[in-house]
């Protein structure tokens, strides 16, 4: 099986974390699994759930680390090592507090903005130069709300609807990303604007 790259969505395993803001990475992978009719592989030795598709993303694995968010690197690192994946062909999808819901950013490298999943991956890989798809969750409209409570809080129906409207653009951009047309993918994601902004207050 020839594997060129990995698309990993970050989140926390367990039903209690489904549809929480911190699990947006998992949600994107779940959508890709459905769209591409991906088949599940054994990822136990990597502490990951893994899928392979024979459609448009046929040379990339879809991965969901099962280590909990703050230890994501302990799953990503052995997976990258086993398949000999370069930093240019690793894409990590995660939630982003510093972007409003409905906005996305695709970039290579950069900081962590305090995201513990990214910190763990950078620590374990020894590089920050992999690609990230940052999906905005915004910050709580309540100044007194703890950040941890916010990211572990469940998405509202309005937020879920907004996220669903992102998926067509994400899928189209990924179709360019895997063909090494990464600048095209970056332009598609970074220029995307919803017709209606979402007010969480």
UniProtKB/Swiss-Prot annotation:
Keyword terms: Cytoplasm, Hydrolase, RNA-binding, tRNA-binding
Database matches in HAMAP family: Pept_tRNA_hydro_bact
First-tier enzyme category under EC: hydrolase
Assembly and binders: Monomer.
Protein family (similarity comment): Belongs to the PTH family.
Site annotation Stabilizes the basic form of H active site to accept a proton: residues: 95
Residue spans crossing the bilayer: none
Binding-site residues, tRNA: 17, 68, 70, 116
Recorded catalytic activity of this chain's protein: an N-acyl-L-alpha-aminoacyl-tRNA + H2O = an N-acyl-L-amino acid + a tRNA + H(+)
InterPro entries, per database record: Pept_tRNA_hydro (IPR001328), Pept_tRNA_hydro_CS (IPR018171), Pept_tRNA_hydro_sf (IPR036416)
Protein role: Hydrolyzes ribosome-free peptidyl-tRNAs (with 1 or more amino acids incorporated), which drop off the ribosome during protein synthesis, or as a result of ribosome stalling. Catalyzes the release of premature peptidyl moieties from peptidyl-tRNA molecules trapped in stalled 50S ribosomal subunits, and thus maintains levels of free tRNAs and 50S ribosomes.
UniProt-listed CDD domains: PTH
GO annotation, cellular component aspect: cytoplasm
Organism: Lawsonia intracellularis (strain PHE/MN1-00)
GO molecular function, one term: tRNA binding
PANTHER family in the record: PEPTIDYL-TRNA HYDROLASE (PTHR17224:SF1)
Protein name per its UniProtKB record: Peptidyl-tRNA hydrolase
Domain of life: Bacteria
GO biological process, one term: rescue of stalled ribosome
Enzyme Commission code(s) on record: 3.1.1.29
Active site feature: 22 (proton acceptor)
